[in-house]
Swiss-Prot record:
Residues 10-22 have a biased composition (Gly residues). The modification N-acetylmethionine is found at M1. One of its GO terms (cellular component) is early endosome. Residues 1010-1035, 1078-1090 have a biased composition (Basic and acidic residues). SMART domains: Drf_FH3 (SM01139), Drf_GBD (SM01140), FH2 (SM00498). Residues 1051-1081 form the DAD domain. It comes from Homo sapiens (Human). Residues 1-44, 536-594, 1010-1048, 1070-1101 are annotated as: Disordered. This is Protein diaphanous homolog 2.
Length: 1101
């Protein structure tokens, strides 16, 4: 895309290239086409809400002088100098085109040129003030620039093709890195191209951008690339709105506000900053009802996340590290609060922000030293004071502190005293006294009362309520109060549970570290004891050879018993057992006979050939005194459970399956339900498809001539030096001193990555005398070449800076696996669940090769859900969960007992081992570098001094972690023996991943069972309610008929008299009064007197 100014250099000369000239006829045709296009171009009309000068100045910038400047409603990123630079210098260009254009045509083309450059009114003003000759020259240059590519029409067509390429790319369903590259390119195009290009793109492109944003927001698990794409989409929307057409399209799309509100995320401060800025602009320049639409979008987005609607904005203000986000949030608050015309609504919005946490944060925000933030805070305070002043004028100039409860009460009292509303106000206060004095319930009551009052006072229609309505408002809020109270209790309990869990993790970590330290000391004690024993032996040998008695035995170490006694001498006449006799000749290849069977068990005999189970009725000799499992004979053919059966040869003495007693769960009712739900049916399998995506990333290289460094290295060093902006000597001294206050991980990583090799640094050192003649990257190389052993030094410093991070990454993983192993072995509810599953499986597998199983592999638990019921409406997992809820509710506690299984499932033993090995290798390299490090020649060089103490600490921390890791692996190996699986082939991540998946599936099955029961109960109640309503309808018709036909048996006179008598006596309303019983316990004498005085019927519930 060529800008008009960029192409002018080729078209602004005094002559044209041969063959490039145009005849007068063709020039006239082009002028006519341009004039027609200018006349027929649709005008973009958008109603922009203007503000008074003082209000607008308060929001956009604080007034520092009394001179009022007219500012544009939509700010553009084009500076006046930049705008002028886009137009080429005015050159005398008087060809046939400029001479033949009329003054009106020149002015029309001049306006079109400025609009195509996306200039706002402030940037257009100085250009309009130029003389007519300059305007004519600029127009001719603009025509030449566009005509160079085939005329105005063809240039526009090329822009359309370019924008349609982006539309096609977005419509093709790209994602991840490819989408990120596309969005970045689109953002640049939306920023640099003229409005016509944005117009062509916006017809389809805006909807595609919103579709992509909605797709990313609906994604449950968002990766880092998804967050980057969201940010790029917001930037594209912001660029798209940077003109009247784009703003009009955004305001015209119903989804835009909701998606922008949903995308507000305090965890992504940069993206949230852009969003709240966009919403602030929309709030100011939008149509009259834009505030209602915006608040509706914010409310809908908050309801999706079950939170207060303004809490994300307040959380953005809490981010102390993102100052721009705080400024943007305060700006958005000011835009929202100052937009309504009604004073009541402004006060309501401001109070809602203050209740959400803004009130406690304002003092801290005012202490920050930032001009932009101070402006927004002053705007907030000034508007607040103005509203209070307006309110005081409304209240006859009575000044009050609205934030003080006592002042507000006295203000209300003075307003209502000696008026007809006084008694109603007194009745309201008396009702407040009836609220139960409970720590949890009282705040919830006032919360609901405040919501009701705000809805009544701030009615959306802007009209007063219907004061003629005299019927009692029968509203039962008991269930709402209870839910609010329960929610408050649950939140408090969850907070306490989180605190206790954190304390427990800290205590457990300290215990593991103490055990590791104790184990290390025990090993040291054993080594010392061995050395003492060896010294004693040597002393005895020396004393026996020289005849000098050896030294007396040293006393045992504290806490250590005496050394073990020497072995007893052989019995008299005894001798060690002789070796077994050699085999007889001729029997070398024959194996010895098998040993006799052990008295107390032992390995079972091998199974028959081919793994065929023995015929029924023949019992096997099971190890460790186990009994044969019961053979079940269901009355119907059951579905089979395809589990991995544990063979008797796999059992160990301490395994879980030896003490299983699943027969205690036997129940005829359970077997009957199994037979009913899991009779044999044909399974239906579904195929799944997988999609693959290719990622491409174009790279561009920038070539630059240098003396020694290659261009790429020089460019990287230039970027690095430009980002840090520190003197080269200061960078060198910070590295020599190992100054951690100045050093950062990013700084060292960039140096390690971008510095050239030592050989090139040595070559640069030779150019020290030509320092001033070198470019900046090579000057930096000259300075850094004076540091000895630079690369090992940087690697060691980087290891020191990241050591604490490595510890914090490794230690929680070890603790999580250790806790998960202990929880799994101690969980009684999980053991009972395994017993129940074993019983159900053996019953369903009766008559198959998996019948009478002693146990099953743990990974089978995730496959329970694959077994469908006969009607395909439920699964075996839902059935087991239902049985547990009905009869064995203690089993339902196992997900809580296995709390750390989820975190353990994310631990990779291989990565953990690799990280520990890498840490040890770095410590060894650091120790070696310190030993061979040359003596410091620079007074700033403190590398050896600081790294020596760090090496000692790092070694101690590593040994402690290594011991904890070994203990963790031993626990996992013991767990493999306990549940009969190979801990060497089944990884930690796989084992605990299966358990965590089963835990999640079980909880989901419990929720689905509860939902199913609720639906069944709801259907049953609806059916009963329908029958009851029909019955009541028949009764009312019957009573009405009786009332009318009272004189049916007599003559036809007196029907109306009877109706009037029934109405007068209340017989016609007797049933209605019975449906609204009054509670005599809630009656209060003052309330009754107040109600009787004003004919009020206020329920004192």
């Amino acid at each position: 895309m060529e800008q008009p100014g960029a192409a002018a250099s080729g078209a602004g000369g005094g002559s044209e290239e041969p063959g490039g000239g145009r005849s007068n006829k063709r020039s006239a045709g082009n002028r006519a086409a341009n004039e027609e296009e200018t006349k027929n171009k649709p005008k973009l009309n958008i109603q922009i809400k203007t503000l008074a000068d003082d209000v607008r100045d308060r929001i956009t910038s604080f007034r520092k002088s009394t001179v009022k400047k007219e500012k544009p409603l939509i700010q553009h990123p084009i500076d006046s100098q930049v705008a002028m630079s886009e137009f080429p210098a005015a050159q005398p260009l008087y060809d046939e085109r400029s001479l033949n254009l009329s003054e009106k045509e020149v002015l029309d083309l001049f306006e079109k040129m400025m609009e195509d450059m996306n200039l706002n009114e402030e940037k257009k003003a100085p250009l309009r003030n130029k003389d007519f000759t300059t305007k004519r020259e600029m127009v001719v240059q603009y025509i030449s620039a566009t005509a160079k590519s085939g005329g105005l029409k063809n240039s526009k067509h090329e822009c359309t093709l370019s924008s349609q390429e982006y539309v096609h790319e977005l419509r093709s369903g790209i994602s991840d890195e490819k989408l990120l590259n596309c969005l970045e390119s689109l953002r640049v195009s939306l920023t640099s191209n003229p409005v016509s290009w944005v117009n062509n793109f916006g017809h389809e492109g805006l909807g595609l951008l919103l579709d992509e944003l909605e797709k990313l927001l609906d994604k449950k698990q968002q990766e880092n690339i998804d967050k980057k794409n969201q940010y790029k989409l917001i930037q594209c929307l912001k660029a798209f709105m940077n003109n009247k057409f784009g703003l009009q399209r955004i305001l015209g799309d119903e989804r835009s506000l909701l998606l922008l509100a949903r995308a507000i995320d305090p965890k992504q401060p940069n993206m949230m900053t852009e969003i709240v800025k966009i919403l602030s602009a929309i709030c100011i320049v939008g149509e009259e009802n834009i505030l209602d639409k915006l608040l509706g979008a914010i409310t809908t987005a908050a309801e999706r996340n079950n939170r207060e609607r303004f809490s994300p904005i307040v959380e953005g203000l809490e981010n102390q590290e993102a100052l721009q986000l705080q400024v943007a949030c305060m700006q958005f608050i000011n835009a929202l609060v100052t937009s309504p015309y009604e004073l009541d609504f402004r006060i309501h919005l401001r109070n809602e922000f203050l209740r959400s946490g803004l009130k406690t944060m304002l003092p801290d925000l005012k202490e920050k030293e930032n001009d932009e933030l101070d402006i927004q805070l002053k705007v907030f305070d000034e508007n607040k004071e103005d509203d209070l002043t307006e309110l005081s004028h409304r209240l006859n100039d009575i000044r009050a502190e609205m934030d003080d409860m006592n002042e507000v009460y006295h203000l209300l009292y003075n307003m209502l005293k000696d008026t007809a509303a006084e008694n109603y106000f007194l009745s309201i206060l008396q009702h407040f006294l009836l609220i139960r004095n409970d720590y949890y319930i009282r705040p919830q009551y006032y919360k609901i009362i405040e919501e009701c009052v705000s809805q009544i006072v701030l009615h959306c229609s802007g009209m007063d309520p219907d004061f003629k309505y005299r019927q009692r408002l029968d509203i039962d809020l008991t269930h709402l109060i209870d839910s609010c109270v329960n929610k408050a209790k649950v939140e408090e309990s969850e907070q306490k549970a989180a605190e206790f869990s954190k304390k427990f993790d800290e205590e457990f970590t300290a215990r593991q570290e103490a055990q590791a330290e104790l184990q290390k000391r025990d090993e040291k004690i054993k080594e010392l004891e061995a050395e003492i024993q060896q010294l004693r032996t040597q002393a005895q040998v020396l004393s026996s050879s020289s005849g000098i008695p050896g030294p007396p035995a040293a006393p045992p170490l504290p806490g250590v018993g005496p050394p073990p006694p020497p072995p007893a001498p052989p019995l008299p006449g005894g001798a060690p057992l002789p070796p077994p006799p050699p085999p007889l000749p001729g029997m070398m290849g024959i194996p010895p006979p098998p040993p006799p069977p052990l008295l107390f068990g032992g390995p079972p005999p091998p199974p028959p050939l081919g793994g065929v189970p023995p015929p029924p009725g023949i019992s096997l000799n099971l190890p460790y005194g186990m009994k044969q499992k019961k053979m079940y004979k269901p009355e119907v053919s059951m579905k089979r459970i395809n589990w991995s059966k544990i063979e008797p040869t796999e059992l160990s003495e301490n395994c879980f399956w030896l003490r299983v007693k699943e027969d205690k769960f036997e129940n005829p009712d359970l077997f009957a339900k199994l037979a009913l739900n899991f009779a044999t049916q044909i399974k239906v399998q579904k195929n799944a498809e997988a999609l693959e995506e290719k990622k491409t990333g174009p790279t561009k290289k920038k070539v630059k001539e240098l003396r020694i460094l290659d261009p790429k290295t020089a460019q990287n060093l230039s970027i690095f030096l430009g980002s840090y902006r520190m003197p080269y000597e200061d960078i060198r001294n910070v590295i020599l001193e190992v100054n951690e206050d100045m050093l950062s991980e990013a700084l060292i990583q960039n140096l390690v990555k971008h510095l050239p090799e030592q050989k090139i640094l040595n070559e640069l050192a030779e150019l020290k005398n030509e320092y001033d003649d070198l470019c900046e990257p090579e000057q930096f190389g000259v300075v850094m070449s004076s540091v000895k052993m630079l690369q090992p030094r940087l690697s060691s410093i980087l290891f020191k800076l990241t050591f604490e991070e490595h510890i914090n990454n490794i230690k929680p993983s070890i603790i999580a696996v250790t806790l998960a192993c202990e929880e799994l072995k101690k969980s009684e509810s999980f053991n009972r669940l395994l017993e129940l599953v074993l019983l159900v499986g053996n019953y369903m597998n009766s008559g198959s090769r998996n019948a009478q199983s002693l146990g099953f592999k743990i990974n089978f638990l995730c496959k329970i859900r694959d077994t469908k019921s006969a009607d395909q409406k439920t699964t075996l997992l839902h059935f087991i969960a239902d049985i547990c809820e009905e009869k064995y509710r203690d089993i339902l506690k196992f997900p809580e007992e296995l709390e750390h299984v989820e975190s353990a499932s994310k631990v990779s033993a291989q990565i953990l081992k690799s990280n520990l090995a890498s840490m040890e290798q770095q410590i060894v390299h650091l120790e070696r570098d310190i030993k061979k490090f040359p003596q410091a020649e620079n007074q700033h060089d403190k590398f050896v001094e600081k790294m020596t103490s760090f090496t000692k600490t790092a070694r101690e921390q590593y040994e402690k972690l290594s011991t904890m890791h070994n203990n963790m692996m031993k626990l996992y190996e013991n767990l493999g023996e306990y549940f009969i699986f190979d801990s060497k082939t089944v990884s930690i991540e796989e084992f605990f991943g299966d358990l965590n998946n089963f835990r999640t599936l079980f909880l989901e099955a419990v929720r689905e069972n509860n939902k199913r029961r609720e639906m069944e109960e709801k259907t049953r109640r609806a059916k009963l309610a329908k029958e009851k309503a029909e019955q009541e309808k028949l009764e009312r018709q019957k009573k009405k008929k009786q009332l009318i036909d009272i004189n049916k048996e007599g003559d036809e006179t007196g029907v109306m008299d009877n109706l009037l008598e029934a109405l007068q006596s209340g017989a016609a309303f007797r049933d209605r009064r019975k449906r609204i019983p009054r509670n005599p316990d809630n009656r209060r004498v003052p309330l009754e007197r107040s109600r009787s005085r004003h004919n009020g019927a206020i329920s004192s519930k």
